[in-house]
Amino acid sequence: MTEQQKNDAAPQSAQGDLHPENEAQERKGLKVPRTVWALGFVSLLMDISSEMIHALLPLFMAGPLGASAVLIGLVEGAGEGAALITKVFSGAAADRFGHRKLLVFLGYALGVLSKPVFALADSVALVFAARVSDRIGKGLRGAPRDAIVAAVTPKPLWGEAYGIRQSLDAAGAFVGPA
């Protein structure tokens, strides 16, 4: 069997794997949409602010607020648990009702509004409320945001678009605690 016959017999997805120039041709002239860059920069800023707080939160709770290690763990666990549970439902809700932008907006708004509460907190209960609110916001925005990235990006650029958004997110996580 000749190379051409193998290519003709291969499924379309495999042909792209055999011929990288096909992918390059599909991508020619395509750009990652501004929406992806905007979501990436918002993720960068949110991660910077979240990681600044997250790095110092245990010290704040243990020091001025007098929280025990167990209580600090409960606050962190409740926050992360709230994020994980919310992620499941936000993705399904976004798909079912089609309100991706609204859920992303609400998720970021909840995160932004919870940040000043940490600075104003004079009790572990207030820190708990802020942490759970912040993490619910993270859970709300994650899946719908990724769906928006897919919806606005041409399919040949999906990898690049997700890479850009995630790289900016990771840069924020790196810079935040510094």
Located regions from the model:
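Structural signature of the two symmetry-related core transmembrane helices
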Residues: 102-116
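Residue-level signature of mid-helix packing/kink "hotspots" within the transmembrane helices
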Residues: 80-88, 173-174
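Helix-to-loop junctions at the C-terminal end of transmembrane segments
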Residues: 86-98
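Helix-loop junctions at membrane interfaces in 12-TM secondary transporters
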Residues: 117-130
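Helix-loop boundary and gating motifs at the non-cytosolic
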Residues: 26-80
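Cytoplasmic helix-loop-helix junction between adjacent transmembrane helices
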Residues: 130-171
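Glycine/proline-centered helix-kink
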Residues: 55, 173-178
